[in-house]
Amino acid sequence: MKRLEDYRGIVSDEIIADLHRRASKLHDKHVVHMNSTAQGGGVAEMLYALVPLMNDVGVDAGWRVLVGSDDFFGITKKFHNGLQGDPVNLTDNKKRLYIQANESFSQYNHISKHDAVIIHDPQPLPIIRFYKKRQPWIWRCHIDLTAPDPGLWE
């Protein structure tokens, strides 16, 4: 597991000190990241490093991985491609399955003690609908949104 000190020599002592200084503003905060896979993707690789580094500088960070059926992940792959410009035809049934998977995930994934939620990519995006607490939510999109299929924004 990486620690910030492992980067000493790659980045300057001033940068490491600056990261600690900036993180001190969040020392009493709980942050949770949500994405759709624990392995095999760029977001997962990033979170494997980022979450321990956040904890190392004193930010209480966690990570939740969305659970869904093969059909759900097939639909979210269409979302992914559509957000990058491919034309997508999502039936009402596919939209319902997408929403239902997020609702189901929300029922056993308790985030009420977190001060901020960071959603990575579109798979868990509608999950905010199913929580009563309205702490800050951040959508960190890791895909190109230059020319998305306009129908996906509906």
Predicted segment positions?
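Catalytic cores of nucleotide-sugar-dependent glycosyltransferases that transfer UDP/GDP/TDP-activated
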Residues: 1-154
